[in-house]
Curated annotation (Swiss-Prot):
InterPro entries: Osmotin/thaumatin-like_sf, Thaumatin, Thaumatin_CS. The keyword Repressor does not apply. CDD domains: TLP-P. One of its GO terms (biological process) is defense response. Keywords: Disulfide bond, Pathogenesis-related protein, Plant defense, Signal, Vacuole. Residues 1-25 form the signal peptide. Pfam families: Thaumatin (PF00314). Gene3D superfamilies: Thaumatin. Transmembrane segments: none annotated. Disulfide bonds join C34-C225, C75-C85, C90-C96, C140-C214, C145-C197, C153-C163, C167-C176, C177-C184. GO terms for cellular component: vacuole. Belongs to the thaumatin family. This is Pathogenesis-related protein R minor form.
Amino acid sequence: MNFLKSFPFYAFLCFGQYFVAVTHAATFDIVNQCTYTVWAAASPGGGRQLNSGQSWSINVNPGTVQARIWGRTNCNFDGSGRGNCETGDCNGMLECQGYGKPPNTLAEFALNQPNQDFVDISLVDGFNIPMEFSPTNGGCRNLRCTAPINEQCPAQLKTQGGCNNPCTVIKTNEFCCTNGPGSCGPTDLSRFFKARCPDAYSYPQDDPPSLFTCPPGTNYRVVFCP
């Protein structure tokens, strides 16, 4: 997501303390409606095993940027919380301290920047689990990506448990936009994702149709397999 990665750090410093003082943390309710277990992950926030029907709530401070929530599949962890996941693995830890390994469907957000939240669903790291990302108290739109992407995934992007974004596999500017703003556009492979999930980012500079805003103070709900 281009905005969240490029939001100036000095602006974060200027506005962060002010909004921490006047705005409460946002609550994110994470719900697993899949028929299988999902190991939810959040940065910031950590991680939690969610069996079918279970939920987990986290509070995120205002001023937080470059944040994301995702689901991991087919995980095995020992009693100390060390192990691995087939998709979305975060350095073999149950309690994530960084981002997950593609492919993983992402709910991304930046809070109070400076007078609105920026939110999106991103497939820039690929797709593994259907997702809905919505406000719990109104004021902005629900975002969904629920198409059967894993089943329809192009052969060159298909991987165990998910569907890679072309940037993960091909790693050129055409797909990764590594040469800066305006250096890339949609491709046939990114259009595969966009046609099935029009709300979601399909490549790194897919900003205008994919980045949404909500009022500051909004609480959110992320649902796996809505």
